[in-house]
Amino acid sequence: MSVIKRALISLSDKAGAVEFAQNLHKLGVEILSTGGTAKLLAGAGVPVIEVADYTGFPEMLDGRVKTLHPKIHGGILGRRDLDEHVAKMEEHGIGNIDLVCVNLYPFAATIAKPGCTLEDAIENIDIGGPTMVRSAAKNWKHVAIVTDTADFPAIAAELEANNGALSDKTRFNLSRKAFSHTAQYDGMISNYLTSLSDGVLSGEPEIGEFPSRFNQSWIKVQDMRYGENPHQRAAFYRDIDPAAGSLSAYNQLQGKELSYNNIADADAAWEAVKSFDAPACVIVKHANPCGVAVAADTLTAYKLAYATDTTSAFGGIIAFNREVDGETVKQITDNQFMEVLMAPKFTAEALEIAAAKKNVRVLEVPLKAGANRFELKRVGGGLLVQTPDINRINRADLKVVSKRQPTEQEWNDLLFVWNVAKYVKSNAIVFGKGGQTYGIGAGQMSRVDSTRIAARKAQDAGLDLNGACAASDAFFPFRDGVDVIAEQGIKAIIHPAGSMRDQEVFDAADEHGIAMAVTGIRHFRH
């Protein structure tokens, strides 16, 4: 391990920079810096040499040229173990730079701003920064590169413990992280530039929805015991910039390691439960809700959701959008076996009760609004990319196509079952009343078969469908689905419409005295 004697610090994100530089100074490290970073460190009393003074060449071209100098890159790239390199560096007065701390211009934040122009974006493409990062990362055996300010405390601690030196393992890991950082940065620039239409050059609207080259960066969270089935290998990766409130932000409080299927099902449950404003419970099995309810509190919501399908709930994923108390957890553990229990927060009593079921995976997930920019689905040799289905409707968005108008209670129930249907695999039919699902028919090739399954589920659960409401995620291709619904005593239906036989479907509703509202929006889910 070689001792670090000279460091170059040039940061856009300066979090923790002063404390880190102070630690370096205590170890006798000479610090080079640029622009705002140099001012920050000097203002905090840290001795700093401006890069322009070190190279004897001023910053120029509005700061575009600061560190692009042989004395900088020679000091970073020179191999200390090659006599020829050492001799050339001595000949040209190039000293070693042993530590480089650089992060890059905030390109992502820039293009996310409303009204960002091509010129704004171009000016926030870093050139000198990535060049230094790649130089240091390439020469990792002799130079340490830090691109993440979150690493400062650990690096400072290791330097102090090793008399100013870093291990080969640390330097190699920092190098790998640095190359990933620049790859992600360049991919982001490529995504932006290739999403622009040619009209950008003439001042026309600049950015399209999808780039012509699509780059994504992911960070591995864990290797998994196996994939969807035991003979498949698998790992879980997190988006490098996940949407607020995403499942990937989970904190596991107890239980066995999450499996591939646990994560897939938990994501389905979480996306569904966070779509409700009122306290809600969603129980999921094989990525499909088998029970959903909204109520005044988590205990009542769970009881109602569980009552929809007590058989399918066994071994399911249970999600809440409110803090969960001990009474709720006790009710769950008394009722059923579960794989995962998730909520934004749990009381101390709830966690104490859950601890008795040590294998149950308990997850806290921040409850924040937000959705991924894109949804991705692999196909053979390709990738399907779409914007997420986050459409929400209210009563004013609906058109009544029946003679009978929905009652006030039916309006509420229609909106509830419609929201649930969005998270059920197509063909999806959802029956419900009073903020509780009464029957869910999922994943059938025939819509009328899904309707019959939903009816059978309600019958098996002993739930009376008289006066309930029904939702269909897509239009009814024939009137048969409406006829089956009417046989159950259901009095209101919500669906998108759009079939060639819409009028037959509307007429069937009138024949049965059913109130029918159409959304004009479909919610297929595959």
UniProtKB/Swiss-Prot annotation:
Enzyme Commission number(s): 2.1.2.3, 3.5.4.10
Keyword Hydrolase: yes
Pathway: Purine metabolism; IMP biosynthesis via de novo pathway; 5-formamido-1-(5-phospho-D-ribosyl)imidazole-4-carboxamide from 5-amino-1-(5-phospho-D-ribosyl)imidazole-4-carboxamide (10-formyl THF route): step 1/1; Purine metabolism; IMP biosynthesis via de novo pathway; IMP from 5-formamido-1-(5-phospho-D-ribosyl)imidazole-4-carboxamide: step 1/1
GO cellular component: cytosol
Domain MGS-like, residue spans: 1-147
Alphabetic keyword roster: Hydrolase, Multifunctional enzyme, Purine biosynthesis, Transferase
Gene3D superfamilies tied to this protein: 3.40.140.20, Methylglyoxal synthase-like domain (3.40.50.1380)
One Pfam short name: MGS
Reaction(s) catalysed by this chain's protein: (6R)-10-formyltetrahydrofolate + 5-amino-1-(5-phospho-beta-D-ribosyl)imidazole-4-carboxamide = 5-formamido-1-(5-phospho-D-ribosyl)imidazole-4-carboxamide + (6S)-5,6,7,8-tetrahydrofolate; IMP + H2O = 5-formamido-1-(5-phospho-D-ribosyl)imidazole-4-carboxamide
Keyword match Lipoprotein: no
Biological process annotations from GO: 'de novo' IMP biosynthetic process
UniProt xrefs under SUPFAM superfamilies: Cytidine deaminase-like, Methylglyoxal synthase-like
GO terms assigned for molecular function: IMP cyclohydrolase activity; phosphoribosylaminoimidazolecarboxamide formyltransferase activity
SMART domains: AICARFT_IMPCHas, MGS
Free-text comment about domains: The IMP cyclohydrolase activity resides in the N-terminal region.
NCBIfam families registered for this protein in UniProt: PRK00881.1, purH
Similarity comment text for this entry: Belongs to the PurH family.
Record-linked PANTHER family: BIFUNCTIONAL PURINE BIOSYNTHESIS PROTEIN ATIC, BIFUNCTIONAL PURINE BIOSYNTHESIS PROTEIN PURH
This protein's name: Bifunctional purine biosynthesis protein PurH
Organism annotation: Neisseria gonorrhoeae (strain ATCC 700825 / FA 1090)
